[in-house]
Amino acid sequence: MAIGDSVFPTEVVKVDNKVIYPDLWKEFEREFEKLPDANANAFIYSLYHLLKKYTSFIPASTQDFPESSLFEHLKTTGAFAHCFAAYKEEFPNVFGNDNRIRNIKSSHFPVKLFCGDISGIQTFIYNITNKAAAKSLKGRSFYVQLLAESIAQEVLEASGCTLINQVYAAGGKFYLLLPNTTLVNNAITDYKYKLEKALWEEFNGQLSVNMDEINFSFILGGERSRILINGESDTTDVGTLWKKLSDKTSAQKRRRFADVFMDSYNSIKPLFEAGGTGGEIQVCAVSGIEIEKNKTKNIKKDDIEQGEEVELPVAAYVKKQIDLGRDLYTHKYLVELVNDSVKGYEAGV
């Protein structure tokens, strides 16, 4: 490409927001009327994306929060409102009586900051041969991204929450704001075990998800609200809360698959005894792992990037990722299908 005026910065055109806001509001109202209202979840998710479209680049407040978008402010406010409402259903007397503000009683911690972090990403992505390297790399990278987003979504749904409660999700890591209720705590405990078991059965320890949480409350008043973490006597700020949870989640790497191992220890067939089929077995041509009998998939010549082979045996999950890598070249959209008839929540890998 030749260097010309087109690659250098140009003069910024200033826009009068006072002129644009009324037009944005009219467009927002027009699209709001089209939102589906037959299903509550469909309405919430549609409203979420509509607000994201129209309010992401509007400041939450031109004086107090000019750097924060109105969309993030609305989303975070909605998440906290949901946490307080759900917690109050279980603990009706959580709030004190005040003429100006509603203080949270000292013995209550209604909000849970929850973190999930996928471990083993680099090893997992690059543990491949050159037989189908390009499609495998692309497919595996995208698969890890989908896995993190799917786990976050499953935790939200198991907890009776929505995308509004998701603070952040990127790079194989996510943070959620959840109500600290018995229902949510039981749902998370149950889901953690199901997920751990599913990941072990699918990847034999190559990928794991570290999860932890911190329950907290607020002390309102003064210039800023202060955060009180359950089990601590001193108040803190958001940055410290975030770091403490990050450190707790990282520490979970030392306890990977602990529940699976304990189940194995107490079961009839312990995990660390001799296993497998023995004899001549097939090995995945891409990852090099052993493949159990009747679980072999084949990739065709179109997906084989080096060598003269017409067909190669691979593990089932490797075949999925190669297919995913190929589909990324030819598809523009990702569509999520939700089955509302399913009761409870099973971890899907």
What are these regions (language model features)?
Residues 1-349:
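Regulatory and interdomain segments flanking nucleotide-handling catalytic cores
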